[in-house]
UniProtKB/Swiss-Prot annotation:
GO molecular function, one term: hormone activity
Bridged cysteine pairs (disulfide): none
Keyword Plastid found: no
Pfam families: Neuroparsin (PF07327)
Name the record gives this protein: Neuroparsin-A
Keyword Repeat: no
Organism (species): Locusta migratoria (Migratory locust)
Propeptide regions on this chain: 23-24
Length: 107
């Protein structure tokens, strides 16, 4: 009986802690109401779906990208995020940037 009560208490504590962290997360709260409206027709490098499932403008060649919860954004089509920068050529407008720092492990 004591083991079951301890397990239930530990589970509740974990749930409350996770909920509290999610509520404090500035990333999830940065887009509320009118702040979430993005004119996707003005996206220079196309649009992507962010970590939270919202459509946002993609990052372009040489732009900062990645991070926890993709805080700095996702790269557009034709590019990938290397060492925190979009590397490759945008298939939207053919602008290019190539990360020359070697392998991503050398960031």
């Amino acid at each position: 009986m004591k083991a079951t009560a301890a397990l239930v208490a530990a589970t509740l504590l974990l749930a409350v802690t996770l909920f509290h962290r999610a509520e404090r997360n500035p990333i999830s709260r940065s887009c509320e109401g009118a702040n979430c409206v993005v004119d996707l027709t003005r996206c220079e490098y196309g649009d992507v779906t962010d970590f939270f499932g919202r459509k946002v403008c993609a990052k372009g060649p040489g732009d900062k990208c990645g991070g926890p919860y993709e805080l700095h954004g996702k790269c557009g089509v034709g590019m990938d995020c290397r060492c925190g920068l979009c590397s490759g050529c945008s298939l939207h407008n053919l602008q290019c940037f190539f990360f020359e720092g070697g392998l991503p492990s050398s960031c």
